[in-house]
Amino acid sequence: MGIEQLSCPACGATFEMGLPRDVTVQSVTTEDREEPDDDRVKVRPNACSNGHECYVMFRF
């Protein structure tokens, strides 16, 4: 597991998220997303230090 530095799409604040190694972050949005049909793509919620919810989509 590695720690990724991501930017909040609402305010630009940096937040950290633990992600499996060798993943590619595909998007960080404020809109909730459903899990894709592809087993290699996951969506996980998180929040920045300002309390904005965001959703991180990544691919294994």
UniProtKB/Swiss-Prot annotation:
It comes from Halorhabdus utahensis (strain DSM 12940 / JCM 11049 / AX-2). The gene is brz. A zinc finger (C4-type) spans 8-52. Keywords: Activator, Metal-binding, Transcription, Transcription regulation, Zinc, Zinc-finger. Signal peptide: none annotated. One of its GO terms (molecular function) is zinc ion binding. It holds the Pfam family Zn_ribbon_Brz. It comes from the Archaea. Activates transcription of bacteriorhodopsin (bop) and phytoene synthase (crtB1). May interact with DNA or RNA via the zinc finger motif. The keyword Metal-binding applies. NCBIfam families: Brz. Belongs to the Brz family. This is Transcriptional regulator Brz.
